[in-house]
């Protein structure tokens, strides 16, 4: 199956405690069907002190399931489904089904 969510995409969270929030995808883990989104699903982690880094409690992003994310429409920022289209020059690109705008390229 082709990747509907890619690194660098702006996505909207559909369910959970961060519902409605949007952020940029930092990393996609296709085997686990999860993604890391900047500023979304933050958890507190206890960090041990090292020579390079100070110890303490830090906030970091936790992975969120891809089924709880939707790509943001480039036109208005609302969640949209993703389709694929082949252009005249033969490139396969993603487009927003909500507005018809191209997501990449």
Curated annotation (Swiss-Prot):
Top-level taxon of origin: Bacteria
SMART domains per record: KOW (SM00739)
GO BP of this protein: translation
GO (cellular component) term, any one: ribosome
SUPFAM superfamilies: Translation proteins SH3-like domain (SSF50104)
GO molecular function: rRNA binding; structural constituent of ribosome
Keyword Ribonucleoprotein tagged: yes
Alphabetically ordered keywords of this record: Ribonucleoprotein, Ribosomal protein, RNA-binding, rRNA-binding
Subunit structure: Part of the 50S ribosomal subunit.
Protein task: One of two assembly initiator proteins, it binds directly to the 5'-end of the 23S rRNA, where it nucleates assembly of the 50S subunit.
UniProt family annotation: Belongs to the universal ribosomal protein uL24 family.
The protein's name in its UniProt record: Large ribosomal subunit protein uL24
UniProt source species: Methylobacterium nodulans (strain LMG 21967 / CNCM I-2342 / ORS 2060)
């Amino acid at each position: 199956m082709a990747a509907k969510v890619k690194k660098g995409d702006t996505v909207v969270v559909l369910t959970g405690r961060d519902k409605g929030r949007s952020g940029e995808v930092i990393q996609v883990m296709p085997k686990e069907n999860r993604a890391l989104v900047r500023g979304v699903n933050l958890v507190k982690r206890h960090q041990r002190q090292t020579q390079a880094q100070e110890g303490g409690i830090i906030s970091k992003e936790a992975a969120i399931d891809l089924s709880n994310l939707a790509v943001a429409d480039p036109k208005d920022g609302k969640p949209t489904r993703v389709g694929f289209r082949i252009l005249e020059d033969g490139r396969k690109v993603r487009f927003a089904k909500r507005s018809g705008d191209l997501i990449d390229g």
